[in-house]
């Protein structure tokens, strides 16, 4: 399988992006060991929009790695998506899916990447309970409900989601070794050996 790893972490204020870089490298090493072909982009290092469109077209799967900042992605990853997805007009998506005959239906169905998948791997200082418990901060919406707009941006291109991986409590109660092992297991479960 051809997999594009996009590291959306960035250095800003007290965040240095080290843990997300670690997880990005765990994914790269694990997937290569499983026999998959990997390309990568580190958003904070810069990118060429047209090259990124080609990478997305090349990939069967995109794995996004990023920290949860103010309930979403770091701004450079959002900018990446705005710039690269827009540059991909005609290749990543044809239109918004609607027709003039029925302009209220089929919005978001103009994507061209129907055979592609994407996966989110994200880190949060929030504990898992903040996402899962009704009455807690995210009111039981779970991580995927919290990330609805990120999912919809990828689904607008026609891609389908793979199971999300989330590491919680990364500042107040970090457990890096446990998280790394859990991520390796997740990658093995989702992707398995390329030769299987």
Curated annotation (Swiss-Prot):
**Positions that bind FAD:** 15-22, 68-71, 107, 123-126
Gene3D superfamilies reported for this sequence: 3.40.50.360
Q: Which GO terms describe its molecular function?
A: catalytic activity; flavin adenine dinucleotide binding
Give the required cofactors.
FAD
**Domain of life, source organism:** Eukaryota
| Swiss-Prot/TrEMBL keywords | FAD, Flavoprotein
One cellular component GO annotation, for this chain's record? cytosol
- Pfam family name, one: Flavodoxin_2
Q: Which PANTHER family match?
A: NADPH:QUINONE OXIDOREDUCTASE MDAB, PTHR46305
Q: Hey, which family's this protein in?
A: Belongs to the oxidoreductase MdaB family.
| Name of the protein this chain belongs to | Uncharacterized protein C5H10.05c
């Amino acid at each position: 399988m051809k997999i594009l790893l996009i590291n959306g972490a960035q250095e800003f204020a007290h965040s240095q992006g080290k843990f997300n870089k670690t997880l990005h490298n765990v994914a790269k090493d694990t997937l290569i060991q499983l026999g998959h072909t990997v390309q990568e982009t580190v958003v904070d290092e810069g990118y060429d929009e047209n090259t990124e469109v080609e990478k997305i077209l090349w990939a069967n799967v995109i794995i996004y790695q990023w920290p949860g900042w103010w309930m979403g992605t770091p701004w450079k990853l959002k900018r990446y998506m705005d710039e690269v997805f827009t540059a991909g007009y005609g290749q990543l998506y044809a239109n918004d899916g609607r027709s003039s005959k029925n302009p209220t239906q089929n919005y978001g169905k103009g994507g061209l990447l129907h055979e592609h998948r994407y996966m989110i791997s994200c880190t949060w200082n929030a504990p898992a309970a903040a996402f899962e418990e009704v009455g807690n901060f995210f009111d039981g919406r779970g991580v995927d409900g919290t990330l609805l707009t990120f999912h919809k941006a990828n689904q607008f291109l026609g891609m389908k989601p793979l199971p999300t991986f989330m590491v919680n409590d990364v500042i107040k109660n970090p457990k890096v070794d446990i998280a790394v092992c859990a991520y390796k297991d997740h990658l093995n479960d989702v992707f398995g050996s390329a030769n299987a």
